[in-house]
Structure formats: C-alpha cells, structure tokens
UniProtKB/Swiss-Prot annotation:
Protein name: Autophagy-related protein 18d
Phylogenetic lineage: Eukaryota, Viridiplantae, Streptophyta, Embryophyta, Tracheophyta
Disulfide bridge partners, by residue number: none
WD repeats (start-end): 31-69, 74-118, 203-243, 248-287
Origin species: Arabidopsis thaliana (Mouse-ear cress)
General function of this protein: The PI(3,5)P2 regulatory complex regulates both the synthesis and turnover of phosphatidylinositol 3,5-bisphosphate (PtdIns(3,5)P2). Required for autophagy.
Length: 391
C-alpha cells in the first residue's frame, strides 16, 4: 500500500490540507493555556519544537528563547519535526480535539506560510524524520523513504511492530545511514544507502526501546525495554564497542544522546535521573571504508584509554569472569535529577553542557565536570509554555 502524495511545485491545492491562512499570526495571550502534546529536538540539538493542542512553537536553546509560534483554531500536532534551523517542518495531527488526521504528514514551509506537500497513509504515523535530502515516514510495521526534491519513493523497509516509531538518520551529506528495529526481537537494521549495504545488529535480548546515531551514522547506541544496559555499536560491521549500565532495576528509556565529539553519552529514563557516560571509541569515518569493504572491521576501534574521565566500575571488577557481569559494569560518570512525573529528553549543548526538555514544559541546562564527574550543576530552568518564559 503506497501512500498518496500531493505536490505541486508551481501551485497549491488546498483541498484536505492547510490553506495559506490556516495559521493565524502569533497571539501570545490566548495560547498560554495550550496543552503540551509533544517535544522534539532538531537534528543538531540547537532548537526544539513543541507540539501543542493549538499548534506548535519553536525554541532556541542557547540562549534559551521562544523563536516563534503558530496557532490554530482546529487543534494541534503530535509530531512536529524540524529540518535543522530551516523554515521547513513536518507536521502530523494529534492531541485534544485535533482536526488534522494522524495518518497524514504535512510538509509546511513557514517562510511561504503554506503546506507545500503531503503524504497520506492507511494507518497512524508513528514518527517522521527529516534530513536535507530525505523524508522518512515511520508506520508501525513499515518505513517509507522519499527523496526530498521530487518526493519520489526510494525505499520501503519492513520491520516488527514499532509503536514507538523508532528510527534515526545520519545527517552528514557524505553519509546516508538509517537505523530502525529489525524483524526480530532485539534486532536493529542499519541501512547504509550510500554503500548499498545492510547491517543487521543483534543488539539486545529484549525489544528495542530507544536508539540514536552519531551525525555521521558510524556509531549506534541502543537500549532495550529492560532499560538497564546501553550498548554502542560500529554500524559498519555490527561490532559492539562498549556497554554501560544505567542501573539494576528495569526502566523505560526515554532518550539516548551522543555528543558531537563522540566522547559522551547521555541517557534519560523514568527513574528521574539523567546519566552521562564517558565513551571509549574513536571514529575514523566512512571514507576509510572503501567500496571494496577493505576496512570494515576497523573503521571504528576502541581506544586503549578514554580522552576524558572514565566511568566508575565496580570495586569487584578484579573478579571479572568469576562473578556475574553486573560486577564489571561501567556506571555513569555524571548525573542530574529531574522529577519522576513525565518524560524528559536530553541532548548535548556547548562544551560540557546538556539540555533537557520535558513533557511538563520544563527546560533545563546543566553543566558537568569532564574530569571529576559527579552531580551536574543546574545553569537554567524555565517552564517554556508559561507566559514569563524568554521570548
């Protein structure tokens, strides 16, 4: 079942989509009662989008401020996907009393103030991912990949039930990598479109709960529904490079983030703690991976020693191989505590800082010590839906 699409480069058909007047001018007074439906980072974590019951809002992280908002009379959006800091967004209806269907993606050009294309499916859309040359639409059992310029369908990927809409993309233009759940429990499928190669990674025994890629797509970090371990893989050959432990009790992992310099990993969960781990891998790059696949086994290699602080291990790690694996685990290097009331999503900011956004409308910016670790220092905290948040 191919999705239907409507795209007219020279004109615009408003039937069943937005008209150019659907978004009224920003009205900061009447929409402060809007309910928050979703939050999502842009591709480089410099901004985030908030889908509300009355439209959407865009926020800049450093310095923190509301960039703009668009208000609707007909409800809001459960998915608001940005394309870096551009005027292009992907929108999917959802939330209280939304008049926009959950099976339709609207590509909105905010500069033109109109919808420039749409995709309609027969089932609910779980996620939409954008990169400068691709639009990726995630359904529960299938993923569609389109060319951005002409909306041509390029790939269809079957996967097992994916109610969370798990899918991540690389964002360097010299790599084209997509990771998603495979067709078996605990399996991740990695598509290297530029190399015409598929890598199947048996990441966990349980179902995949969360995943992320580095910007170049060479590293993959995953967590399962058990939520105790986070694993880092080489996407070229599927090698597991590192494993870190969030905790002992089961947890629902909300987000995993990798720092741009690939030195740090951040994890948030329903346990009310955001953890940062030190990574011990170095990236050579896809360029070292020739078309003959000559260097697939060493395109990513563990370092002998990390470039910064090391994760604490168990004091009984000298008994590795005798005691259970738990006793040789790497634990988090730095932590920050948030209320256990809602979902929080973490991302790395400027040097040694992380930003955290929550479905309660909270924004935190924190600093961590790259040498000594320990508790992070809170730098900022805003309730971004409130009238007194920076604009």
């Amino acid at each position: 079942m191919d999705p239907r699409r409507n795209f007219q480069p020279g004109g615009y058909d408003s039937r069943n989509t937005f008209t150019s007047g659907s978004f009224g001018p920003p009205d900061f007074g009447e929409s402060d009662e809007a309910e928050l439906v979703s939050v999502s980072w842009n591709q480089d974590y410099s901004c985030f989008a908030a889908g509300t019951s009355h439209g959407f809002r865009i926020y800049n992280c450093e310095p923190f401020k509301e960039t703009f908002r668009r208000e609707l009379k007909d409800g809001g959006f459960k998915i608001v996907e940005m394309l870096f800091r551009s005027n292009i967004l992907a929108l999917v209806g959802g939330g209280p009393n939304s008049q926009y269907p959950s099976n339709k993606v609207l590509i909105w050009d905010d500069h033109q103030g109109r919808c420039i294309s749409e995709f309609t499916f027969r089932s609910e859309i779980r996620a939409v991912k954008l990169r400068r040359d691709r639009i990726v639409v995630v359904l529960e059992h299938k993923i569609y990949v389109y060319n951005f310029m002409d909306l041509r369908l390029l790939h269809q990927i079957e996967n097992m039930a994916n109610p969370r809409g798990l899918c991540c993309l690389s964002h360097h233009m010299n790599t084209s990598v997509l990771a998603c759940p495979g067709i078996r429990r605990g399996e991740v499928r990695v598509e290297h479109f530029g190399l015409n190669m598929v890598q199947i990674i048996n990441a966990h025994d349980s179902n995949i709960a969360c995943m992320t890629l580095t910007l170049d797509g060479l590293l993959l970090a995953t967590a399962s529904t058990k939520g105790t371990l986070i694993r880092i893989f080489n996407t070229m050959d599927g090698t597991r490079l590192q494993e870190v432990r969030r905790g002992v009790d089961r947890a629902d992992i909300y987000s995993i983030a990798l720092s741009p310099n690939v030195q740090w990993l951040a994890v948030s969960s329903d346990k009310g703690t955001v953890h940062i781990f030190s990574l011990r891998v170095r990236v050579i790059g896809e360029d070292a991976y020739s078309t003959e696949h000559e260097t697939s086994s060493n395109s990513l290699q563990p370092l002998v020693s990390p470039a910064s602080g090391a994760n604490p291990g168990s004091s009984l790690s000298f008994l590795r191989g005798v005691l259970p694996k738990y006793f040789s685990s790497e634990w988090s290097f730095s932590q920050f505590h948030v209320p256990e009331v809602t979902q929080y999503f973490a991302a790395f900011g400027a040097q040694n800082t992380i930003a955290i956004i929550g479905l309660d409308g909270s924004f935190y910016r924190c600093n961590f010590d790259p040498v000594n670790g320990g508790e992070m220092t809170q730098l900022e905290h805003f309730h971004f839906l409130k009238q007194d948040s920076p604009r």
